């Protein structure tokens, strides 16, 4: 299964990092736990809560130290708020992240949050009882951060199988090598009618100057973009959004031509050479929500930005999402978490520099979404529900053909 760049149809104004992953931001690691359990042939006697499960958890870990003691600056942005995340409000208020970022299926959220609390207490036993040993007389709590999308089309939501042992396993598996596709929190997700999942990408801002107004260089035209800093921006997505006919790749309306096997079985014209008679409709069974069911976007950077600056970057993620086709449906929970690994933070006031960071966010989010689709394999879930892998060769043919036309 190729990533989008391996197909030879995607290019960008800014270069990717060496892994083209969120872990190109130094110190950032990602861990997955993937649960595929139970037969998909559940039959009419199926009882919710008993499986099968096509779900998991993904952890994004900003650094390898004690995150509760050495918090990182963070920000939250809501594109559309139809979701059930945990811990977002305190990050909005204080601009700090003190646990790994966990992504999972919707009804797993409370159990995953509880697991993060347990792990935080194990490493910080003063949580909840004060800092008597250090002479500080107050009490402390912990704010576990958990994002979610609904994987209920393929997985049994009521079973809620992801808890402490699964989160421990994801933490133990954390690495700078980021697996993509139907893994971790992306095991049971759907994207534009195809199999979605986890995707990642990064961008590097060329140059070596400090982040100060006196050292900014003028910008060249797009395509020869240069910017100060040499900073990295990375994105990781959990994709579970969009209608089949909306899918757009490299500016080409792929969803107007490429039909899912489910659509073909329901009587629509087969093949990718003929446009849908009505691009605004689809016979594809949409799963739990006719609009798709959300995307979680995690952004990381090593640039010394404060929470306000990170919030400005997080807001730009919506443009990368829009490049892939979705207008942002009312029933979709679309959230962005951004953090910086730098020790100090500053707000971006200089417009040329903000433009460079914004482009890095837009491109990395767009490419991460493509990778989540192309790296995912076909998954059969509960009651025979199936999400098929997006056919990479057909996508490449359509993009090249559209450009030739």
Residue ranges of predicted features:
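Alpha/propeptide regions of enzymes that mature by internal proteolysis
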Residues: 1-215, 219-267, 271, 275, ...
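ABC-family P-loop ATPase nucleotide-binding domains
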Residues: 286
């Amino acid at each position: 299964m190729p990533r989008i760049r391996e197909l030879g149809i995607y290019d960008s104004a800014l270069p990717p990092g060496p892994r083209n992953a969120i872990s190109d931001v130094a110190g950032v690691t990602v861990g997955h736990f993937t649960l595929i359990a139970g037969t998909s042939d559940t039959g009419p006697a199926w009882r919710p809560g008993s499986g099968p499960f096509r779900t998991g958890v993904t952890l994004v870990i900003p650094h390898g130290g004690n995150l509760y003691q050495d918090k990182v600056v963070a920000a939250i942005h809501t594109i559309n708020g139809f979701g059930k995340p945990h811990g977002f409000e305190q990050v909005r208020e204080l601009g700090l992240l003190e646990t790994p970022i966990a992504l999972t299926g919707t009804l797993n959220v409370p159990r995953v949050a509880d697991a993060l609390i347990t792990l935080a207490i194990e490493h910080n036993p003063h949580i909840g009882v004060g800092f008597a040993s250090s002479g500080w007389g107050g009490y402390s709590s912990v704010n576990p951060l958990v994002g979610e999308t609904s994987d209920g089309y393929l997985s049994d939501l009521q079973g809620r199988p992801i808890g402490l042992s699964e989160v421990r396993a994801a933490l133990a598996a954390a690495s700078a090598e980021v697996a993509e596709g139907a893994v971790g929190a992306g095991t049971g997700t759907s994207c534009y009618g195809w199999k979605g999942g986890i995707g990642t990408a990064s961008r590097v801002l060329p140059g070596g100057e400090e982040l100060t107004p006196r050292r900014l260089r003028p910008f060249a035209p797009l395509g020869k973009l240069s910017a100060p800093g040499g900073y990295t921006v990375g994105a990781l997505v959990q994709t579970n959004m969009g209608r089949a006919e909306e899918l757009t790749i490299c500016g080409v309306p792929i969803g107007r031509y490429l039909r899912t096997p489910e659509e073909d079985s329901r009587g629509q014209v087969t093949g990718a050479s003929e446009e849908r008679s009505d691009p605004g409709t689809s016979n594809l069974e949409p799963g739990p929500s006719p609009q798709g069911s959300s995307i979680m976007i995690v952004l990381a950077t090593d640039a010394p930005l404060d929470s306000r600056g990170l919030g400005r970057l997080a807001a730009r993620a919506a443009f990368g999402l829009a490049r892939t086709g979705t207008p942002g449906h009312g029933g979709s929970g679309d959230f962005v978490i951004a953090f910086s690994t730098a020790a100090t933070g500053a707000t971006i006031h200089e417009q040329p520099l903000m433009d460079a960071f914004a482009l890095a966010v837009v491109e990395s989010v767009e490419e991460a979404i493509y990778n989540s689709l192309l790296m995912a394999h076909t998954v059969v879930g509960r009651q025979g529900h199936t999400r098929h892998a997006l056919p990479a060769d057909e996508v490449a043919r359509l993009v090249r053909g559209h450009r030739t036309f």
